[in-house]
């Protein structure tokens, strides 16, 4: 079976990075679908944000609206049941003895991409797009370029058809991610990201800061804030 190379499935959480990837995919692919996962995350509010982001993109960007198609949300609650992490329980966010933060959910991206590949195969889409990055990131091994290249080979072999994993943010820091979305959609897209996307690990949307909503203390908020400030300083 040969899948359509013009179509892409974006792993879309409703955060800044996955929204940047969605915009990138809409600019580069003729048909774009999205997939999200409910895995018992503390910041489950992101599932509401992803709906708002899709609606806002469709309103603000008519060309992209014509390319934006089906949305899929999978229930992966089992992942929250088998992992004891600060993303899926009320644990403190801290560095662990193994050098990884307590927010690391082992195998999360491997599972996400595996399930996404299954949906993509059924939907005749050959490209998966993800916001994984090893520039500004927390050291998660399943975000690394070599991990994703190996997984691309495994998925292609396992599906008996070529599949591609595109990671447009892999070598971009957060400041350059803001610059990317500015190039793709200008001020309108960046304002949409500021207002509607969610990054905070604690799910806090009580206060909008200059860089968006969040607790302003967790690692995700820190990365987003510093990236926005660096982009503003250099813009």
Curated annotation (Swiss-Prot):
It is an enzyme of class 6 (ligase). GO terms for molecular function: ATP binding; ligase activity, forming carbon-nitrogen bonds; zinc ion binding. One of its GO terms (biological process) is queuosine biosynthetic process. ATP binds at residues 12-22. Keywords: ATP-binding, Ligase, Metal-binding, Nucleotide-binding, Queuosine biosynthesis, Zinc. The keyword ATP-binding applies. Binds 1 zinc ion per subunit. It holds the Pfam family QueC. Zn(2+) binds at residues 200, 215, 218, 221. It catalyses: 7-carboxy-7-deazaguanine + NH4(+) + ATP = 7-cyano-7-deazaguanine + ADP + phosphate + H2O + H(+). Its EC number is 6.3.4.20. Belongs to the QueC family. Catalyzes the ATP-dependent conversion of 7-carboxy-7-deazaguanine (CDG) to 7-cyano-7-deazaguanine (preQ(0)). This is 7-cyano-7-deazaguanine synthase. The lineage of its organism: Bacteria, Pseudomonadati, Pseudomonadota, Betaproteobacteria, Burkholderiales.
